[in-house]
Amino acid sequence: MTQHSRDTPQFYLTAPSPCPYLPGRQERKVFTHLVGDKATDLNDLLTHGGFRRSQSIAYRPACDQCRACVSVRVIANEFRPSRNFRKVLARNSDLVGEQRSAVPTSEQYSIFRSYLDQRHRHGGMADMTVLDYAMMVEDSHVETRIIEYRRRNLSNGPNARGGELVAVALTDVLSDGLSMVYSFFDPSETTRSLGTFMILDHIARARRQGLPYVYLGYWIEGSKKMDYKSRYLPQQRLAAAGWLRVEAEGGPAPEPQE
């Protein structure tokens, strides 16, 4: 193998398979491996182009006759929480987010397993074992963090480590933002809206770190599972002309955003 072939990413196309989001459609993905010294730079570049990371693979939809999957990123510094979002923040004011290295724990897996069993028992991740979970967390050649959300343990003082674990986010740190790779929570906490809370917390974290964006993955028009991503405004959506600004739940602005 030549030096050029080692340094140049190789892209592959998957065979068609049933789309998990839009009934009656087939999906295909183009993917490459994120390995070596240039993995971080490549992940940045590909994320800007609409790719997502899963372990050491970066992928994006490449469906034959469908372009429904649209990459979305929230403009962190301009985001202002709505009344409903402020209520979510208030309901979770007893939680503290602790950023850690991407190291899996049995405590995390217990929450992860309960989350899959209650929320996604028929999904593609339903059969993941503890070893599969460990691979999901550890198999990364880019800057990845775990954020654990725990009940605030006031009995041990204001600076004490949090108490019971209720939610977890696996997050990549990019040059221009935070990319939420996967998040999960205790499904018994039905009144907290923990998925929403973790996104709001990531927006606040990005703002504090001076990072302009929070990448949420794909918004898919017509998929109820993905409708929630359109509520975090202003945001940008990736189109053929580039990243287009969206001010309200509707069409994007006509001019691409840098």
Swiss-Prot record:
Per the UniProt record, one Pfam family is ATE_C
Keyword list, A-Z:
Acyltransferase, Cytoplasm, Transferase
Q: According to its record, what are the GO cellular component terms? A: cytoplasm
Q: Where in the cell is it found?
A: Cytoplasm
The highest taxon in the source lineage is Bacteria
The catalysed reaction is: N-terminal L-glutamyl-[protein] + L-leucyl-tRNA(Leu) = N-terminal L-leucyl-L-glutamyl-[protein] + tRNA(Leu) + H(+); N-terminal L-aspartyl-[protein] + L-leucyl-tRNA(Leu) = N-terminal L-leucyl-L-aspartyl-[protein] + tRNA(Leu) + H(+)
Q: Does the keyword Acetylation apply?
A: no
Q: What is its main location?
A: cytoplasm
E.C. code: 2.3.2.29
Provide a GO biological process annotation.
Answer: ubiquitin-dependent protein catabolic process via the N-end rule pathway
Q: Name one GO molecular function term.
A: arginyl-tRNA--protein transferase activity
Function summary: Functions in the N-end rule pathway of protein degradation where it conjugates Leu from its aminoacyl-tRNA to the N-termini of proteins containing an N-terminal aspartate or glutamate.
Q: Which family does it belong to?
A: Belongs to the R-transferase family. Bpt subfamily.
Protein name, UniProt field = Aspartate/glutamate leucyltransferase
